[in-house]
C-alpha cells in the first residue's frame, strides 16, 4: 500500500471512530453538539495518524491503538477550543468556520473543551481494553503529562 493510501485509510479509521465515540451519550445534547462541532471540524488528523503509524511500524495492531490515537485527537481539539476563547486568543474562525464559542457561547465552549479532555481518558479506560491494565494506565499517564502543565 502506498503512503498516501495508508494515510487516507488511517484518517478514515480515525474519523469513523470519532463519529461513533459519543453515540447514545446525549444527556446534554447542547454540550455534545458543541464537542462534536469542533471534534469533527476536519483537519489533517496528523496526531492520531502518527500514533497509528508508530503502532504499525512497531508491529502492533492498529485497531488496538485506535482508542489511544483518538484520545490524542480529543486532547488536541480541547486545546483548540480553549485557545480560541475570548480570554485567550479570541479567534472568530478555525479552519474557515466560526469558532466553538462563537456558535455555542463561551460557557458551553469551555465545558465542551473540558468534556473532550475528560472523554479522552474515558475513551482509553473504556476502549483500551485490548492492552493490559498496566499498559493502558501507562498510556493514560503519558497522555496526562502531555496534556497538562508539563506538556502543552
Model features per residue range: what roles?
Residues 22, 26-152:
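Mg2+-dependent prenyl diphosphate-binding active-site environment of isoprenoid biosynthetic enzymes
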Residues 1-22:
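N-terminal amphipathic/basic leader segments beginning at the initiator methionine
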